[in-house]
């Protein structure tokens, strides 16, 4: 719940402003970590909603949330982007994952490897 609430609250705070910052280009590593962070949030949301397909994955509440927090903090550090800009990146990735049915399931195997490699 906390991860979902965090994403929604930050997304609302990142609503486009008239003078919104351009989104930074991300490295492959940064883009992959962001994609996985969002995928973990979507899986966590589905798990909380009782969606049976999400039960195929480990519980995302704690580890997924920590991965999301660390990834967004690292993006701010590495790109110099502010919170609003990073949350715009999150929302863009959320839209990209949501526009193709099954996309989250496609990325989760690699994301779970990334999560394990992170040591969380």
Where does each model-flagged region fall?
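Compact alpha-helical subdomains of small soluble proteins
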Residues: 56-120
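Short linear motifs at secondary-structure transitions and domain/linker junctions
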Residues: 16, 42, 85-87
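Sec-dependent N-terminal signal peptides
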Residues: 2-12
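Cleaved targeting-peptide boundary
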Residues: 10-25
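Short N-proximal segments of mature Sec-exported proteins
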Residues: 22-78
